[in-house]
Amino acid sequence: MVDPLDIRAMKFARTEFERRGFDISRVAITSNRGVIHVTGIIPLPQAMADDTYKHEMEVIKQVLRVKTSTKQVILETHRL
């Protein structure tokens, strides 16, 4: 049976990426036992510099850890 906390964490992760303007159509977000995995390709928005991209990813990781009470957030993404 799927843990409701994992479902809530996945939905929150999708919402957080979309809220910050990232296209996550080629990204798989999964959550299992308090660990969120984000894998895939994230196109770099045109107005975003490389340093800003890295900063936004770190902010998203921190927000996901705090708001969803996850143990770890693993980002295995590539930029276009």
PLM feature spans:
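N-terminal targeting leaders
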Residues: 1-80
